[in-house]
Amino acid sequence: MPLVKRNIEPRHLCRGALPEGVTSELECVTNSTLAAIIRQLSSLSKHAEDIFGELFNEANNFYIRANSLQDRIDRLAVKVTQLDSTVEEVSLQDINMKKAFKSSTIQDQQVVSKNSIPNPVADIYNQSDKPPPLSILTPYRDDKKDGLKFYTDPSYFFDLWKEKMLQDTEDKRKEKRRQKEQKRVDGTTREVKKVRKARNRRQEWNMMAYDKELRPDNRLSQSVHHGASSEGSLSPDTRSHTSDVTDYSYPATPNHALQAQPATPSYTAGDAPLHGTTNQGAEHEYRPSSASARHMALNRPQQPPPPPPPQAPEGSQASTSVAPADYGMLPAQIIEYYSPSGPPPPPPPPMIPSAQTAFVSPLQMPTQPPFPASAVSTYPTPPHQPSTGLLATAPPPPGPPPPPPGPPGPSSLSSSPMHGPPVAEAKRPEPAQPPISDARSDLLAAIRMGIQLKKVQEQREQEAKREPVGNDVATILSRRIAVEYSDSDDDSEFDENDWSD
């Protein structure tokens, strides 16, 4: 059915019934025909006015466009006359700063919409019957939809077509994304390489230093190197300890309970409490060196040490005799070192001051719980060979284990400044302080928050790109064509599945 834009009334000039009682019928028909012609002329004049009005509007729009184009041409003509290529060159910066001309074509669309309806069609539309007043039922609906749209909806077909086009465009985009991911997976399938374990070169060289038949077990070597692995990993304090121990070459025991092998010689009973208390603090600050630990692990036989020097008089023994500075012995070993069944202890060797022995403070000496005499004396250890050039004293071969000594005298651990309350206070762990709020401490949180905000912002930008710019046919079709024929997948970087969590 064609849509009539302009209709001329009346359509029939001479068609009509003559009234009764007319004497001259010919004159009546002529007059009615002339009146119909006049009405048609008036209708034509009205349509002519509408047509010329539309032509005037079109001509006015054309004049505006031509005028703007003429203004641009005039400005270009002025610039061309002022530009002298022989004097001044056009800089690339000026060219890059200005955008190139791009024509924006306006496509004709929504011709039959209510806004673009011409006046004759609007008149015909107004003459038609009105729909029933179903819009008064809209406030009573739960879904808040317009009640008139269930009877007549001018945008129904457009909305249906728009939904279908957008769904097809989204399906095309997902298909391209799936193909792109499939190509990426096919291109990146390669063998996963295993990470090579780091090697400890120093430990390997230490193992190679021994003969094949004398190399220690892996477990022993790991425990030894756990206590003192290498010189490069020791602190300056530990290096000074090891230097002192190697200089005096006294028997040393590792810090492990299974490798503690004390030597238990016998001495007089009167000197046991004195020497056990005076040297208990001094022996605690030293740790066994790696060299002595290796000797303990290997259990290699050593030559017996030279006999001790002659015994000092009884009068000067109580004031001058001091236990040898065995840096690796435990308190129980020192007490057993001077048992009541042997000769009195020998005088100490000359002390060589070092960075650790010259300045000793009570707080720097860690305390160790003494082992029982019965458990310690179960594993005897042969004495080590003394270093050349230094006088070293060592106990004779081990004998039967003596009974554990009694409680020390009044000048025992309680009166020693090394084992007083300051040591317990220094041993007590300090309470954890609350973390100080600093800008640097919040750097990681700020970075994470910035990344999250950036992701959300990019997601919103991509969602804005997905939405059509205009709610019209041309924009929707252009976007679908762009998705089908484009090689890039910029609009589909962020999938809704990636943001579901």
Curated annotation (Swiss-Prot):
UniProt PTM comment: Phosphorylation by ABL1 promotes lamellipodia formation and cell migration.
Ranges of residues in domain WH2: 439-456
UniProt biased composition (Pro residues): 302-312, 341-352, 394-410
GO MF entry, a single one: actin binding
Annotated positions of the Phosphotyrosine modification: Y151, Y248, Y337, Y485
PROSITE patterns according to UniProt: WH2
Composition bias, Basic and acidic residues: 182-192
Biased composition (Low complexity): 411-422
Keyword Cytoplasm: yes
One Pfam family from the record: WH2
Comp. bias regions, Polar residues: 219-237, 256-267
Gene from which this protein is expressed: Wasf3
GO biological-process terms attached to the record: actin cytoskeleton organization; cytoskeleton organization; lamellipodium assembly; modification of postsynaptic actin cytoskeleton; oligodendrocyte development; positive regulation of myelination; regulation of cell shape
Homology family: Belongs to the SCAR/WAVE family.
Coiled coil feature spans: 57-93, 162-206
Localisation: Cytoplasm, Cytoskeleton
Descriptive protein name: Actin-binding protein WASF3
Assembly mode: Binds actin and the Arp2/3 complex.
Region annotation (Disordered) ranges: 170-443
UniProt keywords, alphabetically: Actin-binding, Coiled coil, Cytoplasm, Cytoskeleton, Phosphoprotein
Gene3D superfamilies: 1.20.5.340, 6.10.280.150
